[in-house]
């Protein structure tokens, strides 16, 4: 296959009601969700007091996510947010690794080609918007209308900056994840075409590492934003 045959932005469109959606993103997202559900069911089907095998792995993953959430949100209020942070981390982690390990491009489609769900900007923007909604909800649930005082404290002059900050958070989350995963898959694809045997292997291993790091960064920032929403700048300063 010639290098010129590499394409970016080709999509399989599905018409659902009045909406036009990217079909290949839904397919790969369902596959990732299916993998997570199947592994979870198998790991918890026969729970033992002394875990082993898949149960041991899942308990380690749960402990990792719980510690991550606790470190970002704090001992007192982290528990309700473990499911959300854990879902984000596991979905992004498996999605990223699927792009590096699964031969999506061997599956032919009428248009476009399959790739990791996080290789599509729509997926990363959706994850970032969910995170934004959750940290707004967290602050509003705890403080009520008083949550919005942060926009005018310590002075109303900072209102535009505070609003701009709320817009830049989901933008940075979505474009960081999308850009890293897309760049990694493109680099591997180009190297496979040019030198198909040995050279791409180190890059693929590096891609697996960076894919895991991107999932960790996204989940860590989501936890940090929720903590900021729960505590607020003023309360954090008083605590110190």
Swiss-Prot record:
Membrane topology: Multi-pass membrane protein
Alphabetically ordered keywords of this record: ATP synthesis, CF(0), Hydrogen ion transport, Ion transport, Membrane, Thylakoid, Transmembrane, Transmembrane helix, Transport
Transmembrane portions of the chain: 23-43, 82-102, 120-140, 186-206, 207-227
Gene3D superfamilies in alphabetical order: ATP synthase, F0 complex, subunit A (1.20.120.220)
Coiled coil (residue ranges): none
UniProt GO molecular function: proton-transporting ATP synthase activity, rotational mechanism
Assembly description: F-type ATPases have 2 components, CF(1) - the catalytic core - and CF(0) - the membrane proton channel. CF(1) has five subunits: alpha(3), beta(3), gamma(1), delta(1), epsilon(1). CF(0) has four main subunits: a, b, b' and c.
Function: Key component of the proton channel; it plays a direct role in the translocation of protons across the membrane.
Entry protein name: ATP synthase subunit a 1
Organism listed in the record: Acaryochloris marina (strain MBIC 11017)
Gene: atpB1
